[in-house]
A protein has these predicted regions:
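NTP-handling and nucleic-acid-processing catalytic cores
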Residues: 1-86, 134
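Residue patterns forming the tRNA-binding/recognition surfaces of aminoacyl-tRNA synthetases
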Residues: 53, 57-142
Length: 142
């Protein structure tokens, strides 16, 4: 899996793959265990996933990404809200992360993923995350 927002890991509800992607077809309907939280989530098929983009597997976090919200709604997944209104982790995350600022937590999550051997590559990329023009905070779909 690849992600531009590792801090949303605890809000993942499934992994989506394109049903035409031969690499992942045999995994549709199976489950994976998320690192750190050890929560099992299903692998689903959805044509939204671009086979050519990234790994071709998309972590779906409906409460914290607008495209993921659409996928989650389509497949009847309930969004898991992991941030409070101040951008701090709430009680839907492991205890050691609760009340941590989402941006500060990003570094801790990357560090923890590396410690347990679940980090393969770290690179800076440009991506779009919507910010409020008045609040200058990340806009979440929930």
């Amino acid at each position: 899996m690849a992600t531009t927002r590792p801090e949303t890991l605890f809000g993942d509800v499934c992994i989506a793959v394109n049903p035409s992607d031969k690499r992942y077809k045999k995994y549709i309907g199976k489950k994976v265990v998320l690192p750190i939280s050890n929560k099992a989530i299903p692998i689903i098929a959805d044509k939204y996933v671009d086979i050519e983009k990234g790994t071709g597997a998309l972590k779906v976090t409906p409460a914290h990404d607008f495209n993921d919200y659409k996928i989650g709604k389509k497949h009847k997944f309930k969004p898991i809200i992991i941030f409070d209104k101040k951008g701090k982790f709430n009680d839907n995350v492991p205890d050691s992360y609760q009340q941590m600022d989402r941006i500060e937590a990003r570094d801790k999550i990357i560090e923890d993923l590396n410690k347990i051997g679940n980090l393969q590559k770290l690179e800076n990329i440009k991506h779009f995350v919507p910010y409020g023009d008045r609040s200058n905070t990340i806009i979440e779909p929930y």
